[in-house]
Amino acid sequence: MTVNNPLNEIFSNGSAVRILRQLAETMTPVTGRECARRSNLSHRTALENLNGLESTGIVNRIFGGRDHLFSLNRENLFVKDVLIPIFEQEKKLKRTLYRLIVDHYKDIATSILVFGSVARGEDTPESDLDICIIVPDESTKRKIEKRTVSVLLEVKQKFGVTLSNILLTEKEFRNGVDNQIELYQNIVNESKLLFGTSIKEIMHGKALTGKESK
């Protein structure tokens, strides 16, 4: 690993970053094949990058058996003081983003859900953050609409993320699901609850405001 500007070496390769992120989340050594699976890379690409990371001293290789095992070298100061804190902050950043959105709407929303490419883990730099906000009635929907522009601007300014909201009353949501409209089906199948009442409870008419998702 270079002494001057080591981040240039590490973060110039997206595949290496994926591997390091996965290794940072486990204390147990993994095979190259398992690392490839977790990082959503081909086995060959994963091994090439693991070899390179081993040469920098960031990754340890354990020899033995048919498959070599790999782990993050947690005694390495660059790993301890730079990489692990960066990945921890990366996860915290998403939680902070979701918290900001929830805090703006939780006083009157029935449910707040994230769906689309972000919920599927398939987002790209060009992707919007799709949020579905379900409210009790039309009057509440109008209150939400008045807040939307300022929230969109704040999210863009602080996180560089383009927010795309869909606002629905509980009745609109139930009707859309019952009529098997594709957008509503996608929300049912892939969404993650950020705040409030679950989709199942809404469909059964048991919506309650003020309940935060864990």
Predicted regions and their residues:
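Catalytic core of pol beta-like nucleotidyltransferases
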Residues: T2-T110, A119-P125, P136-K214
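Short beta-strand->loop micro-motif that forms the acidic, two-metal-ion catalytic signature
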Residues: I131-I134
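Conserved catalytic motifs of the protein kinase core domain
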Residues: D128
